[in-house]
Amino acid sequence: MKLYFVRHGETDMNARNMFYGWYDADINAKGISQAEELRDAFREIHIDKIYSSDLKRALHTAQIIADGRPIETMPEIRELYYGKWENRTWEEMTEEDRVVLKQWRTDWENLTMPEGEAFLDFYNRVTEGLDRIIRENKGKHVLVVSHNGALSAMHCHLTGAGPKGFWNFNSKQGYYSAVWVSEKKLTYDCFNYPAVWKKGE
């Protein structure tokens, strides 16, 4: 089978560098444009099934790309829940929160954001969702629209990097990745391939 991975388009919260996971922000004008560019790119690509996170920013992106084709939403592939850090910028955090965040970024497998989702619970949730997608779509071409953290977990799972590789897979908005998956072999056609080539890329 072949898996295509897309991160949702830009939101105003992305533009402001805010922390958010389950906060249900929609994509902004730039995000809509990114999704439209991806829609045009995927018109040339055969897709049998489309899955999306149930959060608005991913689903809206998927709906634009799908261009009328059906989409199956999956809560399992939504982003990490940030707890009390949801909908905040670095500047809006207390000094104590900033210290904890720095610690979390170096020991994310063992530390949990205040009132948030434990990383390994998140990782297992997402990868179990990906396993279901693979199990139910053998031999098919599948598009998955999700979030940066969730997509990173998926790439970690596919490559065998595991949770320790979490920071090694940063999915850009307006780009896609494509992976051939079989029982014996994993082959990346591309990672962060632009929907539209722009000057300087």
Question: What are these language model-derived features?
Answer:
Residues 3, 7-61, 113-126:
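Loop-to-helix element that buttresses phosphate recognition and phosphoryl-transfer chemistry
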